[in-house]
Structure formats: C-alpha cells, structure tokens
Amino acid sequence: MDISDHHMTDVGIIRPDVHIEVHVKSQSTAKRSDVRTHVLSLLDRHSTVLRSFKWMDFDNEFLTKNVESVTIADVTGPKLVDLKVHNLCIHIFTLNDDSPSTLNLEEEEELSAANLWLLPAVEFHGVWESLIYEEGIKTQLLDYVSTTIFFSDKNVDSNLIAWNRVVLLHGPPGTGKTSLCKGLAQKLSIRLSDRYAHSQFVEINSHSLFSKWFSESGKLVTKMFQKIQELIDDKDALVFVLIDEVESLTAARSAAQAGTEPSDAIRVVNSVLTQLDQIKRHPNVVILTTSNVTEKIDLAFVDRADIKQYIGPPSAKAIFNIYLSSLEELMKRQIIYPRQQLVSLEELETMNFMESDVTRLSLCLMNISQRSVGLSGRALRKIPFLAHALYGKTSTMTLKGFLTAMEHAVNKQRQEQASLVNCV
C-alpha cells in the first residue's frame, strides 16, 4: 500500500493521526503541493521511523534545495512509529524572522501596551521541544486548543456546550509558563496553517496598565482591546493573546475592595474581564494567561478559564531529560568530546539500574538529576553553562569530566538557594 493513500483502510476504521512538520527554507519559492509530494515520497521510503525523528539531510535535490527539516512531531507511546497505519497530517511552514512590533496606545507618551509577533516566528522556534514536563501536560494543552477551534468551526452551540477559549497556567516562578504559552501558540500556528492564512501572538504588558497613567487605565484597557479586536476581525488570522502574571490585574480588585488600593483598580480589572468576554466569543482567538500566585487570582477570572493547569518544578525524571537534551547539544557542538552514548531512564529501568560500562555515566546523570529536584526549570537550563564556566578546566571536556562539573554546579546552586532562603 502506498503511504500517500493515508485516510482510511476499511470503511469505519479511522487511523490515528501522526503529525509531520515540514520546515521550508525562507528563500524557497516551491509550491506547497510540490513540497508535499516530495515529502510523501520520502515518508514512503521510510515507513517505520523513530518517534520525534527529524530529517535534516536529504538524498533528494528538491528537498535539499527547499526544505530545512522534516520532523515526526509530538508522538507518544512506542519508540517506533509505523507510518503506514497512521493518517499523515503534513504541516508545511516557513519561519517569520521579523522582530516583534509594539501596540502603542498613546503616541505622545509612547505607552507600549503589548508586543506583537507574526507566527510561526524564528524567535519561538524550538521553544516547545525544549520544554520538558510530566507526560501528558503539553499534549493536553495542544488537544484542548485544537478542540476549541474544531468546535468553533463546526458551529457547536456554546450555550449548550460551554467553552471559553481561556487557558490559565499557574505555578511557581521559573517553571516555563510563559515559554509554554509561546511554544503552544507557535505549535498551533503550524498545525492550523491550512485553516488560517496567518497567526499572530499578542503579549500584553499587564504592568503598563498600572503605570503613571493609572487614572486612565480603564480607558487604556478598552483602547488596547480595540486594537486586538482589529486583528481578530481578520477571519483568516488565528490570534493568541497572552496576559502574563495575570494576578497583577486580578489581585488589584480585591485590594481595592479592602481599601488598600484606589478604586481605579476595580475599573481596570472589570474592564479587562469585560473585554476578555467580548473577544473570546470569536472563533479565531485563544487567550493564554499565566500566574505565579494562584491564590491571588480573582475567582471571577478563574471561572472563565477552561483549563487551569498547574506547572510545578520538574520531577527527577523530567530533570534527567532536560539535562540529557543539554548534553546532546554540547556533544553535537563538540564542547563535550568524544561523543558518548547516554542511556535513557526507561532503558536504565529495564536494566534494573545495574552499574556497568554501558550505564555508568547515565547513572551518574540520574544521581545529579535527583540532587537537582527543587530547582526551577530556568535554573536547570543554566546548570550546563555554569558547569563549564566555573568548573571547566579546558574548553573541550569529556562527558565524565563534564558530569563532575555539573555536580559541582548543582551543589553551588543549592547552596545559593539555601542562603537566599535564610536571608528572607
């Protein structure tokens, strides 16, 4: 059976989807239909592949000239994927390398209310893949937003089945909530590129709404959302709106009610909630919000969110995978040399964590990961850099030497963390 015949095998049997992301070079002038044909031919020759496999070198002149990479994306489950039993969803995209523009509210004051990116953006490329959480978190978020758009397309009556197109990610600082929002928007702009001609990402600077223009903040909120509404009015555009640290908006209302903040704060928050209610009615908008302090969020806001996902500090397993991806990158760049194979946690488990020449370095990494529990995702990503900067005796290091340096860096990070806690 030709792999390009990829819808149904028998009547009534629906195959599971597998997503193929095709990153086309920015200078390419090739038609999408031609790119698709050549990619299907490539997949037909490699019908069984590793999940998350990425082709970057091709034996096909057309693909070499026009395509940066072809990736089997976001597959969970078995390591090997049989493409012949899947429905192939091919997503062809080019990255936008424009810098973000700003949404200014007051020309004379140059008050920047938000930053605006065209997606998929070079700046967000690889963010989704770099974020490692407990299994299921990223998939659930992706499925949720995809379903909201699917229900909207099918004109499902929202009075009978309610959904708000609002996502709230909450948890301690440094766990990657803002990056996850950016990665999610980037991923969906690629997934839905056949449905929407283009996607935009608006990041609202909530702190600017509580600036020296405080007395006018209610009006400024309205003005900002009017500008966002103009983006949403283009029905060929998918618009993501990010409100970071939403507690700074919603906490203001309870503080004002308690008499500790001016009543203008209530007007600002009420204005934000009213404007969100207006824009979320549109099928082509998704509202993403983050909070570092869950208990300070206004209940009226929490009730508006369909998904309230806690993003906590990484577990030892997630930390192992974070470090593993960092070490792979350093071996690729020959900062760690020679390249040595590290065994995954799953493979260590099947070997009952027995020490041998094959597992020794991986077990060392596992111990470092366990020692790192409690550090934020932001801190964890800095450990390899600190290891080299502070404890690297030479510019190029062996894997064993680098793991020793990482151990020192983790110990230093934990000592600094303890010192800060004691100072408070």
Swiss-Prot record:
SMART domains: AAA
Gene Ontology, cellular component aspect: chromosome; nucleus
Record SUPFAM superfamilies: P-loop containing nucleoside triphosphate hydrolases (SSF52540)
Pfam families registered for this protein in UniProt: AAA (PF00004), AAA_lid_TRIP13_C (PF23242), TRIP13_N (PF23563)
One Gene Ontology term of the molecular function aspect: ATP hydrolysis activity
Disulphide linkage map: none
UniProt KW keywords: ATP-binding, Differentiation, Meiosis, Nucleotide-binding, Oogenesis, Spermatogenesis
Ligand binding (ATP): G171, P172, P173, G174, T175, G176, K177, T178
Family per record: Belongs to the AAA ATPase family. PCH2 subfamily.
Family matches, as PANTHER family: PACHYTENE CHECKPOINT PROTEIN 2 (PTHR45991), PACHYTENE CHECKPOINT PROTEIN 2 HOMOLOG (PTHR45991:SF1)
The name this protein goes by in its record: Pachytene checkpoint protein 2 homolog
Gene: trip13
